[in-house]
């Protein structure tokens, strides 16, 4: 959204989504912003399996790989939205290099740390979601020779909670966005 409404800017100091509105005990609303802050809050306050490992070192490494995802998302987003071939190629190369780095860290799967879905998986799922929308041959080139990253991407795409995280018209809306940006990938 290029022209954000005033009500949104009032709620979101960073001007970004997502936002989470929470009713406090006294009836007053509190707004949380920033994806990871919201994820941490939900992990700490909602029932279910914890999304982080119990071991402090493993948990710290999970958080480090979550931090790594921010740069990956930035490179991917610039690649997806590029209207110039040189920028698209540069960002695709950077993203591919980051995937190669992750490849060596991945377990035998299906998720980042093995059989258990974790916060790392929840953070990377939106990154990998775009690859089900863009041209399949482009996805194949980016993931070529990276069997663990490819399997991880597939496992996340098949997970019901990941599918349910976006509206049924997500692909249509994203393609519309690419056309608005005159992105190379929209052609």
Label for each model-derived stretch:
Residues 114-137, 142-151, 156:
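GST superfamily/GST-like fold recognition
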Residues 33, 91, 129-130, 143-144, ...:
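Catalytic cores of transferase enzymes with a strong primary signal for eukaryotic protein kinases
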């Amino acid at each position: 959204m290029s022209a954000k409404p005033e009500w949104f800017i009032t709620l979101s100091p960073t001007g970004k989504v997502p936002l989470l509105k929470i009713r406090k005990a006294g009836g007053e609303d509190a707004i949380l912003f920033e994806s990871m802050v919201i994820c941490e809050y939900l992990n700490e306050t909602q029932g279910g399996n914890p999304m982080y490992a119990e071991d402090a070192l493993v948990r710290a490494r999970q958080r480090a790989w979550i931090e790594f995802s921010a740069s990956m998302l930035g490179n991917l987003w610039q690649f997806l939205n590029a209207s110039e071939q040189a920028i698209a190629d540069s960002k695709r190369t950077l993203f591919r290099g980051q995937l190669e780095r992750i490849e060596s860290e991945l377990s035998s799967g299906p998720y980042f740390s093995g059989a258990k879905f974790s916060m790392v998986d929840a953070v990377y799922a939106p990154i990998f979601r775009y690859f089900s929308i863009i041209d399949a041959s482009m996805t194949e080139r980016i993931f070529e020779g990276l069997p663990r990253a490819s399997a991880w991407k597939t496992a996340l795409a098949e997970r019901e909670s990941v599918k349910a995280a976006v509206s049924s018209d997500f692909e249509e809306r994203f393609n519309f966005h690419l056309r608005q940006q005159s992105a190379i990938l929209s052609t």
